Amino acid sequence: MRVLRLSLPFALFIIVFLFISCTSTKFSTLWKDETYQGHPEKILVINAFLNPANRRIFEDEFVKELKDRRIDAVVSYTSMPDPVVSDKDAIAAQAKRVGVDTVLINRPIGTTTRETAGFTTYQDLYINTQIDVYDMKSNRLILSATAETWIRQDIPYPIHIKSYVKDVVQRLLQQGLF
């Protein structure tokens, strides 16, 4: 019985620690057009990261998260080559071609490195991103956010992408975008 009393608080501590450590994305700014009254019906998801594999993993994961919430979405990589993901005219043409009313663009805006001291000193890497959501019917920006995501070196990059996508979708839901 004594072992149970000692191990229960420890188990609760571990659960809380794991829950907190899973949320590695912090949103530093978020702006939403309060006059926007619509709800996206079909979203074109564009990831402007330079690495083609990361672009595809991100877009696939984002579309999956949206579809799990019954929101129609499509990836851009199947019909937009990597170099044109930052070309506004190409994006508008692609949006029209695939029949979307909303475009979500995720792009890197920099990295930050911070030293953490403990028993040993190590560096934490943070990727800073910008998420912009456009209403294609009115051709205007309806949401813009910047985020910072902690990248642990011992965790595979696709796991970071999945966690980041969940955090972004959750934040967009909280903002009433979907």
Task: Specify the residue positions occupied by each region the protein language model found.
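A structural "domain/chain start" motif
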Residues: S21-M80, A90-V100, Q174-F178
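Solvent-exposed loop/turn segments at secondary-structure junctions
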Residues: L50-A53, S79-P83, I109-T113, E148-R152
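A generic structural signal for short, solvent-exposed coil/turn residues
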Residues: A11-I14, Q37, E65, Q123
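C-terminal/domain-edge helix-coil "capping" segments
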Residues: T23-K42, T121-N128, D132-F178
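Soluble non-cytosolic domains of exported or imported proteins
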Residues: F49-D60, D82-D89, N128, D154-S163
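Surface-exposed short loop/turn segments
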Residues: S86-R140
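Sec-dependent bacterial lipoprotein signal peptides
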Residues: M1-C22
